[in-house]
Amino acid sequence: MTVSENSVLETEVLVGGSAMPNERPGAMEPQSLSQMPEGFPRRSTVANGVRSKVSRRFFVVGGALALSAFAIYEMGAVFSIGGITPLEYLMLVLFAINFCWIALAFCSGIAGFFMLLKKPKPNELEQTELHTRTAILMPTYNESPDRVFSAVSVMAEALSQTGHGHAFDWFILSDTTDPEIALLEEQAFLVLRQETHKHSRVYYRRRRKNVARKAGNVADFCRRWGSRYDHLLVLDADSLMESSTITGLAQRMQADPDAGLIQTIPSLINGTTLMARLQQFAARIYGPVIGTGLGWWVQKEGNFWGHNAIIRTEAFMGAAGLPNLKGKPPFGGHILSHDFVEAALIRRAGWSVVIAYDLPGSYEECPPSIVDLAVRDRRWCQGNLQHSRILPTKGLHWVSRLHLMTGIMAYLSSPFWLLLILTGLMLALQAHFIRPEYFTDQFSLFPTWPIMDSDRALRLFYITMGVLFGPKIFGVLLLLKDGNFARSVGGRIKAILSVIFEVILSALIAPIMMFIHCGAVMSILMGRDSGWSPQRRDDGSMPWLTLIYRHRWHMLAGVMLGYAAILDSLTLLAWMSPALIGLWLAVPISAWTGSIKIGEFFKRIGILATPEERNPAPICIRAQEARAAYQAHIEQPWTLAQVLKDPALMELHLAMVDKQPLRAAGTPIEPVEAIVHVKVHEAQCQQSALALFNRQEMALVLANPLMLRSLQKLPEQFVPEDLVSFC
């Protein structure tokens, strides 16, 4: 496939040609999870091209297992002096599960710490000429069009100036279901085409039905246009990427014929609320330690986080077609967290999956409030728990299974931590209220005392805290060691103050998130589906009554736990106070952290600053400026009534409607489509028809040229016949 291959359907309606290029259909079959497909794994093109070093696995995974074994032994020794009771056995099991989880992150952090001490530099591939073609995909679902289209505009312009722009095509793949946003997208696309048609090829497609959500959106593109391209560079609606990063990914993929997927580690940007800036700071200071360590030891068995990554089209279409899981949601149906599964399937087929921890210039945004984080995590939690159905898949690499298990534990760890806390509380209350049985039924000259090894328990507590906070400590050490890094966040004093503030605020938020995740897990186990709601990305504020409703159970849980603790002693209450205060103040914490005003205050005084905030990359500055311009361009949105009234506007709209056939002859018609057909057929004028449509029906009409033509033929308003005769 060569760069010169670029024929599209030309039309005079749209500047720059048709909304989408010619289709070149290709197969992307759902993969079997119960048996290894024939021909897998493929033979590597380069000798040892997909082989990883065992020594790195031994250091991180082996180290985590050894550390966990030591901690579990010590915990058992704490209880074993006086004999282990059933409640203590339960606590030992819960401790083992939780410690193994944090030990792996700690050992990855050690590896990342020493790697970052050496300051790894990206491979110099900038001079490599690109002879492959890459489709850059920007999926969007009911997002603000000004954000999405302005980002594509500035990235496309920057890429065109590198001399490599000819090797890339841009695609905005819309799954938008809101008819008003759909029309705004079309307006924004016209502006985008005006700006970019001389230097870039930019396309737009909105699906009529968003089957299988984002994974289905990308799969639809692959089956219809994927064969035109060697690579797919997948972004998210809030993604930004520097041109050097885009070309660097394509060059790395081109240089490694065995690479199936290369994932960048995005930096968080554009946070305005306190919660968003907290996440930005934590991700910037501590995130590289974990991310670099992970990339170092997983090597060719990396992971995919759904965006800001480049994928070899052959590998993706040939190996990563997702099957539907048997049964109904939440555990059956479409695979929600598709990214981990796609990476595992690509690796199963014999392609490498690499985390490019040394490649900067990749950006994304984060939820602005605790509530928005909870909404996103509810969906992610369901998708990750769904991975329990994927774990037994035939032929997966053990590291891929570990990625899936890690994703599951990201949410199951909260119930396990809560159970551990409750078990410890029950042990304390048992010791306080239940009279010990000094002489048991078994004959003994000495009484049985309920004792623990308190010195060993305290030592184990310090070890556990060290393992838990180890990655944070590593990040702070790297920050303080690097003078340039420290200055980029406001200096060492501001950096230390920011770290202290982040630790305190995170400690207050952590118990709230623990209960949110526990609620999500319980909801999923009860069979409730998460649905798919669009994300808020800017303002995280909500009415106080809404926040009280959202956090009512968290506050109640805090009161009950506090009451149980004080029944034992004030000392126990003091020990539990860091977690309890967060629960008691859940509503004001949620309100304050979701506030832009408070976020701006901490920005002014330089707390939680990041290098990207203090000295943003040119691409980020241009994106903000372009977004303001796009907001001005589409401040007067089209309406369906205007489209029906204006023939030129109708032609523009139809030029952007997906050209896929509406429905094969003889196939069942969907209820909503049948209802719309009846409403259009019975309508006496456009005004009466539009008044009858709900939002779902209006979105369907916008995507159906036949219905639009039928509506266009109707009079704009109904005039009774007798009134016409009188006139």
Curated annotation (Swiss-Prot):
Molecular function per GO: hexosyltransferase activity
EC number: 2.4.1.-
Top-level division of the source organism's lineage: Bacteria
Pathway assignment: Glycan metabolism; osmoregulated periplasmic glucan (OPG) biosynthesis
Region span, Disordered: 18-43
Compartmental location: Cell inner membrane
GO biological process: glucan biosynthetic process
Family matches, as Gene3D superfamilies: Spore Coat Polysaccharide Biosynthesis Protein SpsA, Chain A
Entry GO terms, CC: plasma membrane
Keywords: Cell inner membrane, Cell membrane, Glycosyltransferase, Membrane, Transferase, Transmembrane, Transmembrane helix
Predominant place of localization: membrane
Membrane topology qualifier: Multi-pass membrane protein
The keyword Chaperone belongs to this UniProt entry's keyword annotation: no
TM spans (from-to): 58-78, 90-110, 278-298, 408-428, 460-480, 496-516, 572-592
Annotated family: Belongs to the glycosyltransferase 2 family. OpgH subfamily.
NCBIfam families (alphabetical): PRK05454.1-3 (NF003956), PRK05454.2-1 (NF003958), PRK05454.2-5 (NF003962)
Function, as annotated: Involved in the biosynthesis of osmoregulated periplasmic glucans (OPGs).
Name the record gives this protein: Glucans biosynthesis glucosyltransferase H
Gene name of this polypeptide: opgH
